[in-house]
Regions:
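C-terminal hydrophobic helical "lid"/dimerization subdomain
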Residues: 3, 243-247, 290-342
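Glycine-rich beta-strand-centered segment in the early N-terminal region that forms part
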Residues: 18-34, 45-90, 132
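Residue-level marker of beta-strand positions
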Residues: 57-59, 77, 91, 116, ...
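NAD(P)H dinucleotide-binding glycine-rich loop of Rossmann-like/cofactor-binding domains
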Residues: 86-167
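A short acidic, Gly/Pro-enriched loop at the edge of an enzyme's catalytic core
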Residues: 220-229
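Glycine-rich phosphate-binding loop and adjacent beta-alpha segment
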Residues: 238-302, 339-342
Length: 342
């Protein structure tokens, strides 16, 4: 089968490898759509593992099922989680499923940028979701990123009538905007350095958009009657985004560290200025649990999140190198979908 083998952001090669063989309890998925995620381009995180087949935002059709698979059949339309928890360890029982050791060890074989992938037994048991007829394959690729956003806002304890600042208006930021708007918040400000994405932020529900080079705390105060943001969501890995977030959070508010940064970046905290008498909460989130996936899929099915308008590029598997360039440039683009069957 054809795969897109990742060597670096500038070197993604079409290669042929054997189609995975499945065993008892496993499923072979024919991949119909796979989204390029910004984390696919984190060379500091990916290069030491290369060469490898990336792609974790996937949807497709069951091409074969192993002995003992009971709840799914060949031809079923599905999306799948690449990481799944054990549901029995200390972390899972504490509600922190996405820091489970099992979750960190599970994955697809080989990855979503391939014509086919193998779903191991534990993924079949906990990480497969049947697609309703009204959800397309390309829409289903958003289940994974939306699940991550859901988990982040849950851990940040987002409440109705709060004010929200989203720093970085890429795909994750736009999903945060839409989900926060669905949650009944009073006010959303979004920032970015790209005008195209600021326009997208307004389109998807931000009340105010501001270029990230502006003095963000001052802009918030001007539009909220003097208050800062109750929740600040950092959807940019830039060090400047962290500084902006810490300066922009209201007393009693929360900063959610959602996007990863390069290694070595630290948080510039003045403990007294930030915490003493201010009750500021700093929190983070990683990934989504199977329960988050289920909620995300239902939101998409119900039309609560506008997915199709976020897809700006659709490409065949052989065009994935161009897809990586489009995502890396981050200009007139949002989500790039790869269709491995063409």
């Amino acid at each position: 089968m054809r795969v897109a083998m990742y060597y670096s952001n500038r070197d993604v090669r079409m290669e042929e490898i054997p189609t995975p063989q499945i065993g008892p309890g496993e499923i072979l998925m024919r991949v119909e759509a796979s989204g390029i995620c910004g984390t696919d381009l984190l060379e500091w995180y990916r290069l030491h593992k290369a060469p490898l087949v990336l792609g974790h935002e996937v949807a497709g059709v069951i091409a074969a099922s192993g002995e003992g698979v009971e709840h799914y059949k060949v031809g079923d339309r599905i999306c799948a989680a690449h990481h799944v928890p054990c549901n029995t360890c200390h972390y899972c029982l504490s509600g922190h499923h996405t820091v489970c050791d099992t979750l960190r060890q599970t994955n697809f074989d080989p990855g979503g940028f391939a014509e086919y992938l193998r779903l191991p037994g534990i993924n079949v048991e906990q990480g497969i979701f049947s697609l309703p007829d009204e959800v397309s394959f390309e829409e289903a690729t958003f289940v994974e990123p939306l699940a991550c956003v859901l988990r982040g806002q849950k851990l940040a304890n987002l409440q109705p009538r709060q004010s929200v600042l989203v720093i970085g208006s890429g795909v994750a930021g736009l999903l945060h905007i839409q989900l926060a708007r669905n949650s009944g918040v009073d006010y959303i400000m979004a920032t970015d350095i790209v005008d195209y994405r600021l326009e997208a932020a307004r389109k998807f529900g931000a009340d105010v958009t501001v270029h990230a080079n502006e003095y963000i705390p001052g802009c918030i105060r001007q539009t909220t009657g003097g208050r800062l943001a109750d929740l600040v969501v950092i959807c940019s890995g830039a060090e400047s985004a962290i500084n902006q977030a810490l300066e922009s959070v209201e007393r009693g508010g929360t900063v959610l560290f959602f996007a990863p940064t390069e290694p070595g970046i630290s948080i510039p905290i003045s403990v007294n200025d930030l915490f003493w008498r201010n009750e500021i909460t700093l929190t983070s989130s990683y990934g989504g649990s199977p329960a988050d996936y289920a909620v995300a899929l239902e939101l998409i099915r119900a039309g609560k999140i506008r997915i199709r308008e976020m897809i700006t590029h659709r490409m065949g598997l052989a065009e994935i190198g161009l897809g990586f360039k489009v995502v890396a440039l981050a200009q007139d683009s949002l989500k790039v979908i790869i269709e491995p069957q063409r």
